[in-house]
Amino acid sequence: MTTSSYFLLMALGLLLYVCQSSFGNQHTRTFDTPKHRCGSEITNSYMDLCYRKRNDAGEKRGRASPLWQRRGSLSKLKARAKRNGAFHLPRDGRGVVEHCCHRPCSNAEFKKYCG
Protein backbone atom coordinates (compact mmCIF):
# COMPACT_ATOMS: atom_id res chain seq x y z
CA MET A 1 0.00 0.00 0.00
CA THR A 2 1.47 3.34 -0.97
CA THR A 3 1.63 6.35 1.27
CA SER A 4 -1.00 8.28 -0.70
CA SER A 5 -3.45 5.34 -0.54
CA TYR A 6 -2.87 5.03 3.20
CA PHE A 7 -3.40 8.78 3.67
CA LEU A 8 -6.59 8.69 1.58
CA LEU A 9 -7.93 5.75 3.60
CA MET A 10 -7.21 7.53 6.89
CA ALA A 11 -8.84 10.76 5.64
CA LEU A 12 -11.93 8.84 4.54
CA GLY A 13 -12.16 7.12 7.93
CA LEU A 14 -11.85 10.43 9.74
CA LEU A 15 -14.52 12.00 7.52
CA LEU A 16 -16.88 9.08 8.23
CA TYR A 17 -16.29 9.46 11.97
CA VAL A 18 -17.01 13.20 11.91
CA CYS A 19 -20.20 12.72 9.87
CA GLN A 20 -21.46 9.98 12.18
CA SER A 21 -20.81 11.95 15.35
CA SER A 22 -22.42 15.15 14.05
CA PHE A 23 -25.53 13.48 12.62
CA GLY A 24 -25.91 10.96 15.44
CA ASN A 25 -27.36 13.56 17.83
CA GLN A 26 -30.74 13.56 16.13
CA HIS A 27 -32.05 10.79 18.38
CA THR A 28 -31.35 12.33 21.76
CA ARG A 29 -34.14 12.80 24.28
CA THR A 30 -35.68 16.16 24.87
CA PHE A 31 -37.52 17.21 28.02
CA ASP A 32 -40.88 16.09 26.65
CA THR A 33 -39.86 12.94 24.77
CA PRO A 34 -42.34 10.15 25.63
CA LYS A 35 -40.79 7.52 27.89
CA HIS A 36 -41.83 4.53 29.98
CA ARG A 37 -42.21 5.18 33.71
CA CYS A 38 -42.67 2.18 35.98
CA GLY A 39 -42.37 1.57 39.72
CA SER A 40 -40.43 4.23 41.57
CA GLU A 41 -40.09 6.28 38.38
CA ILE A 42 -43.83 7.02 38.59
CA THR A 43 -43.37 8.30 42.15
CA ASN A 44 -40.33 10.37 41.20
CA SER A 45 -42.11 11.82 38.16
CA TYR A 46 -45.13 12.67 40.31
CA MET A 47 -42.90 14.49 42.79
CA ASP A 48 -40.96 16.31 40.06
CA LEU A 49 -43.83 17.26 37.77
CA CYS A 50 -46.88 17.56 40.04
CA TYR A 51 -45.75 18.59 43.50
CA ARG A 52 -43.03 21.01 42.45
CA LYS A 53 -45.51 22.77 40.16
CA ARG A 54 -47.79 23.53 43.12
CA ASN A 55 -45.02 24.53 45.51
CA ASP A 56 -43.05 27.00 43.39
CA ALA A 57 -43.70 29.85 45.86
CA GLY A 58 -42.16 27.88 48.74
CA GLU A 59 -39.10 27.05 46.68
CA LYS A 60 -38.61 30.70 45.75
CA ARG A 61 -38.46 31.55 49.45
CA GLY A 62 -35.82 28.87 49.97
CA ARG A 63 -38.01 26.42 51.89
CA ALA A 64 -38.37 22.83 50.81
CA SER A 65 -41.64 21.11 51.54
CA PRO A 66 -41.67 18.30 54.13
CA LEU A 67 -42.92 15.86 51.50
CA TRP A 68 -40.09 16.80 49.16
CA GLN A 69 -37.55 16.29 51.98
CA ARG A 70 -38.93 12.81 52.56
CA ARG A 71 -38.95 11.88 48.92
CA GLY A 72 -38.38 8.21 49.69
CA SER A 73 -41.45 7.99 51.90
CA LEU A 74 -43.95 6.20 49.71
CA SER A 75 -46.54 5.97 52.50
CA LYS A 76 -46.99 9.75 52.58
CA LEU A 77 -47.37 9.82 48.83
CA LYS A 78 -50.01 7.08 49.03
CA ALA A 79 -51.88 9.01 51.72
CA ARG A 80 -51.76 12.15 49.59
CA ALA A 81 -52.98 10.24 46.54
CA LYS A 82 -55.89 8.84 48.55
CA ARG A 83 -56.73 12.27 49.90
CA ASN A 84 -56.93 13.99 46.53
CA GLY A 85 -57.64 10.92 44.41
CA ALA A 86 -55.03 11.86 41.81
CA PHE A 87 -54.03 8.32 40.94
CA HIS A 88 -57.46 6.79 41.35
CA LEU A 89 -59.29 8.79 38.72
CA PRO A 90 -59.37 6.94 35.42
CA ARG A 91 -58.28 9.05 32.47
CA ASP A 92 -59.81 7.79 29.24
CA GLY A 93 -60.45 4.47 30.98
CA ARG A 94 -56.77 4.01 31.84
CA GLY A 95 -54.69 4.64 34.92
CA VAL A 96 -51.26 6.18 35.17
CA VAL A 97 -49.57 2.76 35.16
CA GLU A 98 -51.47 1.64 32.08
CA HIS A 99 -50.79 4.91 30.33
CA CYS A 100 -47.16 5.59 31.30
CA CYS A 101 -45.66 2.21 32.21
CA HIS A 102 -47.08 -0.10 29.57
CA ARG A 103 -46.83 2.63 26.93
CA PRO A 104 -44.54 5.66 26.81
CA CYS A 105 -46.01 9.01 27.82
CA SER A 106 -44.70 12.56 27.69
CA ASN A 107 -44.43 14.92 30.65
CA ALA A 108 -47.50 16.81 29.41
CA GLU A 109 -49.51 13.57 29.37
CA PHE A 110 -48.22 12.62 32.82
CA LYS A 111 -49.30 16.00 34.24
CA LYS A 112 -52.92 15.07 33.48
CA TYR A 113 -52.68 12.74 36.50
CA CYS A 114 -51.66 15.55 38.87
CA GLY A 115 -54.32 16.33 41.46
Curated annotation (Swiss-Prot):
This is Con-Ins G1a. Venom insulins constitute about 1/25 of the total venom of C.geographus. It comes from Conus geographus (Geography cone). Its main location: secreted. Coiled coil: none annotated. This venom insulin, from a fish-hunting cone snail, facilitates prey capture by rapidly inducing hypoglycemic shock. It is one of the smallest known insulin found in nature and lacks the C-terminal segment of the B chain that, in human insulin, mediates engagement of the insulin receptor (INSR) and assembly of the hormone's hexameric storage form. Despite lacking this segment, it both binds and activates human insulin receptor (long isoform (HIR-B)) with a high potency (EC(50)=16.28 nM). GO terms for cellular component: extracellular region. The keyword Thylakoid does not apply. One of its GO terms (molecular function) is toxin activity. It is found in: Secreted. PROSITE patterns: INSULIN (PS00262). The keyword Transferase does not apply. Keywords: Amidation, Carbohydrate metabolism, Cleavage on pair of basic residues, Disulfide bond, Gamma-carboxyglutamic acid, Glucose metabolism, Hormone, Hydroxylation, Secreted, Signal, Toxin. Heterodimer of A and B chains; disulfide-linked. InterPro entries: Insulin-like, Insulin-like_sf, Insulin_CS, Insulin_family. The modification 4-hydroxyproline is found at residues 34, 104. Residues 1-24 form the signal peptide. The modification 4-carboxyglutamate is found at residues 41, 98, 109. SMART domains: IlGF. Belongs to the insulin family. Residues 25-29, 53-94 form a propeptide. GO terms for biological process: glucose metabolic process. Disulfide bonds join 38-101, 50-114, 100-105. Expressed by the venom gland.
